[in-house]
Swiss-Prot record:
Listed Basic and acidic residues bias regions: 281-291, 611-642
Description of post-translational modifications: Phosphorylated in response to DNA damage.
Domain of life: Eukaryota
Function: Regulatory subunit of the slx1-slx4 structure-specific endonuclease that resolves DNA secondary structures generated during DNA repair and recombination. Has endonuclease activity towards branched DNA substrates, introducing single-strand cuts in duplex DNA close to junctions with ss-DNA.
Keyword Ligase: no
Lineage of source species: Eukaryota, Fungi, Dikarya, Ascomycota, Pezizomycotina
Composition skew (Basic residues), residue ranges: 90-103
InterPro entries for this protein: Slx4_ascomycetes, Structure-sp_endonuc_su_Slx4
Name of the molecule in the record: Structure-specific endonuclease subunit slx4
Gene: slx4
Compositional bias of kind Polar residues: 107-116, 599-609, 712-723
Region Disordered, residue ranges: 36-161, 266-312, 464-498, 579-649, 680-726
Species this protein is from: Aspergillus fumigatus (strain CBS 144.89 / FGSC A1163 / CEA10) (Neosartorya fumigata)
GO molecular function: 5'-flap endonuclease activity
Length: 811
């Protein structure tokens, strides 16, 4: 009869590595009895008193009579018996919970029950089927089992579970699996059961849904839009880009009605397919907005009355400035607005809002007045900040407006004249049909071709009758002009045109009177036509010195003395004829002098008829002499122009007034210096003026016209050439003409080299060199002082200074 036992063996020996496998198919009944599969059910824990007892003793062990050499098997069996009793107690508790009777009915009475009933250690009974070999192997397995139980006593192993989780049904099933029927006759069946059962590991629990959400693998149906209209929409793309006037009108109205152009407002979408249906066209939307605004204003406290007005009238700097320009742009939209509005109430509201905008621009008064006075021109700082004049911008705007108006006026007749030509027909479509702007109209005539306009330089022209010089540099024919002057003097009907600037003309006449050997009657007649005494104080030093030299005096350094001498000479010369003709003192002649015949009539009234006849004869003689001298002067002028042109072509040196750093490389060669000497000698020897001067004239000595009937050369040429050159220009020439130092070490550089090297110039030394050697290079007899040299240096930006031991302070 097969018996099944459940044995738990505790060992107190040290831990050893188990070399046997649990699932061994060749094990016998004894091995199967010892190596039962480990139960997965929780085992009952031993009590605290059992744990603290010695591991080799138990409460059921009775010490022997001192024979310690007894077999160890009996001791091991006694220990296993105690453990089996504990296991039986736990089994009884499990049987109380349920299912103990069922299990006993199904299972036959086995050896485990007898062990549980008897507290004594059981003695194994060997059947006849067992052999000696089997007993030997059983002893070995028992020893291994006892070692395992002893090593297990050191470590408390178990599984703690909550009482509510485990169920009785599961416990019964597990206990059934743990208890295996061991019979020597059915070993192959036991082998199959061990292979099927395996290690009896508990099945892993299913993962909780709270930790990781499960992936929804189900297919979801996606509702797709109907794309049938896309084919038609693609063809209508270009139509949507068109300009819709109604939509633009509604947008401009919303901007003007809501307030300033820069106010942050809600975006309003406009239906492009139906442009007529917009929020501005619906009166209900406007009424709703007005109601919302009224409710907001009613909720505000009464103390904020002033702030309400300010919030209603949005006044910003940008709004005020741009409102001046947006007024004109929105005037042409009023008619379109009236067509779109649905009711009179909405139109009245919009009108009130536009009035509020206008009043908003005008308030507060001072700020708006200040803004209106300003002229706004948009540009960069460098473009706007050109001049400091406050009226510059306003004048510029006036000129721009005037030019625009003139363009508009010019377009009207041009359109009428071009209508007949048929070039610009409004029926054809062309990009050249638009109106032209200022850039296209400039320098073109009415027919559209380039206009060849002659440009006249009116800066130096002081008389209307004077002809401008020809572009190729040729001078007007003076012989023809002189002939016309003589004819005009002979005729009593033609008036004589006289310029306002008469100082140089007086000088020329005085020179002519002083040089020409005429009779005292002729000089008296010529002096009668002389104008009042010129203002010598306005003349330059060169003109004064020239005039003094004409009277026979030596050049003077003092300006006041020269002026006094000239005034006395002029009074002494014109004292005899001054009583004949009366002039307005201090006022220049305005060109309203009488004719030659009127002057003769005045002289006839003061003198006898005989004197008048003699004067007429003298006049005719003077005219003949003037005609002869004019022809001679023209011949000399032609020769002088030829010589000057030849000199200019031969010499490539350009005479410069200013001293620059780059002039150290442009030093004249000896041949150029020789040509300059020859030119200066020819200028000084020639009593007649040269028409073209290679040296620039000073700003004060401008060209003047010869309006009288004199046969002398023009006053402008005589003033620039016959007069002595300026001392400043002479100093510049002398500095440049000084020979260059050719020494190796350059211990004594020239004055020009010192100036170029920014060396300080000692004024006393420089003035001494000019008076002794420098001015002699340019044939100048005058002398200069250190103070005059200082002024010349400062005007040219040259570093200069006096000596330290001098009384003057060092510069």
């Amino acid at each position: 009869m097969c018996t099944t036992t459940d044995v738990v063996v505790l060992s107190s020996s040290p831990d050893q590595i188990r070399s046997c496998s649990l699932a061994n198919p060749k094990c016998g009944a004894e091995k199967a009895f010892v190596l039962s599969p480990v139960s997965s059910s929780p085992s009952s824990l031993p009590s605290s008193s059992d744990l603290f007892q010695p591991p080799t003793r138990s409460r059921f062990f009775k010490p022997g009579g001192g024979n310690e050499g007894s077999s160890r098997t009996a001791r091991e069996e006694s220990e296993t018996g105690t453990k089996q009793n504990d296991l039986a107690a736990s089994r009884k508790k499990a049987a109380v919970r349920g299912g103990r009777q069922k299990r006993t009915k199904e299972q036959p009475p086995n050896e485990s029950q007898t062990l549980f009933d008897n507290p004594e250690p059981p003695i194994p009974k060997h059947n006849g089927c067992t052999s000696k070999k089997g007993t030997g192997s059983r002893k070995k397995r028992i020893d291994a089992a006892s070692k395992c139980t002893k090593s297990g006593s050191k470590k408390i192993t178990g599984k703690v579970t909550k009482p509510g989780i485990t169920e009785t049904t599961k416990f019964e099933n597990k206990t059934k699996i743990v208890t295996s029927d061991v019979s020597p006759g059915k070993s192959p069946a036991n082998k199959l059961e061990l292979e099927k059962d395996g290690l009896q590991i508990e099945v892993a629990m299913k993962r909780r849904l709270d930790w990781t959400p499960t992936k929804d693998t189900g297919k979801q149906a996606v509702a797709l839009d109907d794309t049938g209209d896309n084919k038609t929409r693609f063809g209508e793309l270009l139509s949507e880009y068109g300009f819709l006037k109604a939509a633009a009108v509604s947008q401009t109205d919303s901007k003007l009605s809501d307030g300033a152009p820069t106010k942050c407002r809600r975006l309003e979408l406009v239906d492009t397919h139906n442009p007529s249906t917009s929020k501005r066209t619906s009166p209900d939307a406007d009424s709703d907005r007005s109601n919302v605004r009224s409710t907001r204003s009613s909720r505000a406290p009464a103390a904020e009355g002033k702030s309400k007005k300010r919030s209603r009238k949005i006044t910003t700097l940008t709004g005020r400035v741009t409102a001046l320009y947006t007024k004109d742009c929105t005037d042409h939209l009023d008619a379109a607005n009236t067509m779109i509005r649905a009711s009179e109430d909405v139109s009245s509201k919009l009108l009130s809002k536009s009035l509020d905008l206008d009043s908003c621009v005008l308030a507060p008064g001072d700020a708006v007045d200040y803004l209106q006075d300003q002229d706004l021109i948009f540009g960069t700082c460098s473009q706007l900040e050109r001049e400091d004049s406050p009226t510059m911008l306003r004048d510029m705007q006036k000129e721009i407006c005037a030019s625009k108006n003139s363009m508009i006026e010019n377009r009207k007749p041009s359109s009428t004249t071009r209508a007949g030509s048929g070039l610009y027909s409004h029926t054809t479509v062309s990009r050249f049909q638009t109106q032209r702007d200022l850039w296209s109209v400039a320098a073109r005539d009415m027919d559209g071709s380039l206009a060849e306009i002659e440009v006249l330089d009116m800066v130096d022209i002081t008389d209307v009758s004077e002809l401008p010089p020809k572009p190729n540099g040729e001078l007007p024919d003076r012989s023809e002009k002189n002939d016309e002057d003589t004819v005009s003097q002979g005729e009593s009907s033609r008036p004589i045109e006289i310029t306002d600037d008469f100082g140089v003309e007086v000088d020329v006449r005085m020179e002519y009177l002083a040089t020409s050997e005429t009779k005292p009657e002729e000089t008296a007649y010529a002096a009668s036509e002389i104008r009042p005494m010129p203002r010598f104080a306005d003349w330059k030093d060169s003109d004064l010195s020239r005039q003094v030299r004409l009277y026979g005096f030596k050049p003077m350094k003092n300006r006041r003395k020269m002026i006094e001498v000239l005034e006395r000479c002029w009074k002494a010369q014109h004292s005899s004829t001054r009583t004949g003709v009366q002039y307005a003192p201090g006022k220049p002649d305005d060109g309203s002098t009488g004719k030659a015949g009127t002057i003769g009539s005045q002289m006839n009234k003061q003198s006898s008829k005989m004197d008048a006849a003699e004067k007429m004869r003298r006049e005719s003689a003077c005219l003949k002499e003037k005609a002869k001298s004019s022809t001679a002067l023209e011949d000399k002028l032609s020769h002088a122009t030829d010589r000057s042109s030849q000199m200019l072509t031969k010499s490539s040196f350009a005479h410069m007034e200013e001293i620059e750093d780059s002039e150290d490389e442009v030093i004249p060669s000896p041949s150029q210096l020789q040509s300059l000497y020859k030119r200066h000698i020819s200028e000084s020897r020639s009593s007649h003026p040269l028409p073209v001067s290679d040296t620039p004239s000073t700003p004060s000595s401008r060209t003047r016209t010869n309006a009288d009937s004199d046969t002398k050369p023009s006053p402008s040429d005589s003033a620039t050439e016959s007069s002595l050159p300026d001392l400043a220009s002479q100093i510049t020439k002398a500095v440049r003409l000084q020979p260059r130092s050719f020494s190796v070490d350059c211990k004594r550089p020239s004055w020009h080299e010192k100036i170029l090297m920014y060396d300080p110039i000692i004024l006393e030394d420089f003035a001494t060199w000019l008076n002794i050697e420098g001015l002699g290079l340019v044939h100048e007899d005058r002398e200069v002082s250190a103070e005059f040299v200082r002024q010349w240096c400062e005007s040219n930006g040259i570093c200069c200074g006096f000596r330290k031991n001098s009384r003057r302070s060092e510069r």
